[in-house]
Design a protein with these regions (language model features):
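Hydrophobic faces of well-ordered beta-strands that scaffold small-molecule active sites
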Residues: 36-42, 70-74, 103-108, 144-146, ...
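Short, acidic/polar
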Residues: 50-65, 124-133, 235-243
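Acidic (Asp/Glu)-rich catalytic clusters
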Residues: 33-35, 60-66, 84-104, 133-140, ...
Length: 316
């Protein structure tokens, strides 16, 4: 039974005890009758923000007024020097609240490597993230998103060799150590620490799942990204396998998009297949639009991604 048909059945039939038994049977075979909600990741507008055409403080207004979205995911690089500026954070929060927009998380980059093999550098990286945990709490977010790749100098390159840092298992231990300490700090104020597949071994779903198991804390989790599965150079991990491996730990999901065909489908990712993986894992939270393409301008790319997600949702 399609999830949408399940919802109709659930809302129109309420009278008999026999039906409640039928519903229990259906529910056991339908992992997520609530489907999902859509949010906007600020990186979707990175060129527009970097050009100064819009200001970070107007991000929530764009999400709500231009796209009808009521939840956002911030990127720390767009207010990097404001993490401890209470007046600025207060203005961010007020603007979101006035618009009825939920602040979901802060994506954090350029604060050091949580899995750095140098213990002093690793500790420094952990502590560098504390201010973002505090900022997330102030803004009403549930999480900060961090990276589990081991050296930021290698992240995103085509030539960096992650195998020179240590064994596969050793890199699990290093990343888990930094993540565990940061997660324990966040736990003191109710903030999750979630990891995105974002290059290097973090784009290996099996490896990142092993890191989650090693940390073994209710406040640690993943942010599966549909597209970030390039490990290094031309070495890619299967995106569907990767998302499936990361979904058991997911506290957010990123719908990465680059380009679309004439039917409005993303050409790199089968959104129907991917969203079924997401929903079959029991996930019913926000799925964040993260448009990274160049053929469409950012506003059009965001709208195309939103339209596709809604089309997929209507088909389920």
């Amino acid at each position: 039974m399609k999830r949408r048909n399940f919802l109709k059945l659930a809302t129109t039939s309420t009278t008999t005890l026999a039906f409640s038994g039928v519903m229990s049977s259906i529910l056991s075979g339908c992992s997520n009758p609530k489907l999902f909600k859509i949010s906007l990741a600020e990186w979707s507008l990175h060129r527009t923000l970097q050009s100064g055409k819009i200001n970070h403080l107007d991000f929530c207004k764009v999400a709500k007024n231009d796209f009808g979205l009521d939840a956002v995911e911030y990127v720390n690089s767009f207010f990097f020097d404001k993490a401890q500026d209470q007046s600025y954070l207060k203005e961010m929060k007020q603007r979101a609240d006035d618009l009825g927009v939920k602040s979901l998380l802060i994506m954090c980059d350029n604060e050091g490597s949580l899995g750095d093999p140098d213990p002093i550098a690793r500790t420094k990286a952990v502590e560098n993230h504390y201010k973002w945990v505090d900022a997330a709490k102030f803004l009403g977010c549930h999480s900060i998103r961090v990276n589990a790749y081991l050296t930021e100098s290698l992240h995103g390159t085509s030539t960096g060799n992650y195998n020179t840092i240590g064994s596969y298992e050793n890199q699990i231990n290093l990343a888990a150590d930094g993540l565990r300490r940061l997660t324990e700090f966040g736990d003191t104020i109710g903030i999750n620490t979630i990891v995105e597949n974002h290059g290097g071994l973090s784009s290996n779903g099996q490896w990142l799942a092993a890191v989650m198991e090693k940390v073994d804390h209710p406040r640690v989790g993943t942010l599966p990204d549909f597209g970030n599965f390039r490990i290094q150079g031309e070495e890619w991990y299967d995106r569907y396998k990767g998302v499936e491996e990361l979904m058991p730990y997911a506290k957010a999901v990123s719908a990465k998009s680059h380009d679309f065909d004439s039917q409005g489908n993303e050409i790199n990712t089968d959104y129907y297949k991917m969203m079924n993986i997401v929903l079959d894992a029991g996930y019913s939270g926000y799925v964040g639009i993260e448009y990274e393409g160049s053929k469409l301008d950012e506003m059009a790319g965001i709208q195309a991604t939103k339209d596709l997600l809604e089309k997929v949702k209507d088909s389920l």
